[in-house]
Amino acid sequence: MRGSTAMLLAAIALFSSQSFATAIGKSRTLRSFEELEERQLASGSGSNNGLDDVKRSALVELLGEKVVAGGPTSILKAMMKLSDEELQNFIDKNIGSDSDSASGGN
């Protein structure tokens, strides 16, 4: 039983570390927020992840120009340092505002 559990945990750890390494590798190749947007538009995947719903100016207001200019990795690191309340306020204020206004929420 212990052997099976250890094998399962090892498999999960290996899968997680490979996925994490792949994500880090991809984010290191991005140099700016604009480059991320260009890649998303070129691949047609921009509408799949919610980043299109957030204006760059909103990120600059929340995190600062220097962080946003640092690209996706620095944006994610900075957002991970925010409190749950700050993140929720940002989400409520900026994400999905188009659907809110269409339904009369704004």
Curated annotation (Swiss-Prot):
Subcellular location, record wording: Secreted; Host cell
UniProt feature coiled coil, ranges: none
Domain of life: Eukaryota
GO cellular component, one term: host cell
Parts of the chain that traverse the membrane: none
Induction of the gene: Expression is up-regulated at the earlier infection stages.
Main location: secreted
Signal sequence segment: 1-17
Keywords, sorted A to Z: Secreted, Signal, Virulence
UniProt motif (RxLR-dEER) ranges: 28-39
Domain notes: The RxLR-dEER motif acts to carry the protein into the host cell cytoplasm through binding to cell surface phosphatidylinositol-3-phosphate.
Family label: Belongs to the RxLR effector family.
Function: Effector that may act as a suppressor of cell death to interrupt plant immunity. I.
Protein name per Swiss-Prot or TrEMBL: Secreted RxLR effector protein 18
Record organism: Plasmopara viticola (Downy mildew of grapevine)
